[in-house]
C-alpha cells in the first residue's frame, strides 16, 4: 500500500498508526528525513475516482531527492518495479529537473532535484 511505497522509495518512517475498529478508518503519519510529514488515511468503502491531469485540486505531490543522478536512479527503480513513468526525467521549461510517476492508488509523484 501507500505506507510501504513511501517507506521503500522515499525513505519515510511511519508511526504505529491509528485504527478505529468500529469504522475501519486507518491513518499513518509518515516522517521524512527533512522533517516533513505526510498523513495517509483510508477506510473501507471510500470512493476513489480515477485521477487525471485535467481536474482541479491536487494533481501531484513532489519530493526532492537532492541531485539529478538520484532522480534518474529512483525513476529507473520505480519503472523496473512496474510503476508508470509519465514524464522525464527531463529539465522542464521552468528549469526543474524532474520525472513524474503514477504510484499507489493512481497518485502522481513528481521526483525533483
Regions found by a protein language model. Give the residues of each.
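Core segments of cupin and vicinal oxygen chelate
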Residues: 1-37
Amino acid at each position: 500500500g501507500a505506507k510501504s511505497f513511501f517507506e521503500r522509495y522515499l525513505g519515510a518512517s511511519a508511526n504505529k498508526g491509528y485504527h478505529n475498529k468500529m469504522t475501519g478508518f486507518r491513518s499513518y503519519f509518515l516522517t521524512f528525513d527533512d522533517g516533513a510529514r505526510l498523513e495517509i488515511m483510508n477506510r473501507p468503502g471510500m470512493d476513489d475516482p480515477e485521477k487525471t491531469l485535467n481536474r482541479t485540486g491536487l494533481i501531484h505531490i513532489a519530493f526532492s531527492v537532492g541531485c539529478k543522478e538520484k532522480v534518474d536512479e529512483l525513476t529507473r527503480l520505480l519503472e523496473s518495479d512496474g510503476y508508470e513513468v509519465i514524464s522525464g526525467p527531463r529539465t522542464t521549461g521552468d528549469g526543474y529537473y524532474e520525472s513524474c510517476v503514477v504510484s499507489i492508488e493512481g497518485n502522481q509523484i513528481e521526483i525533483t532535484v
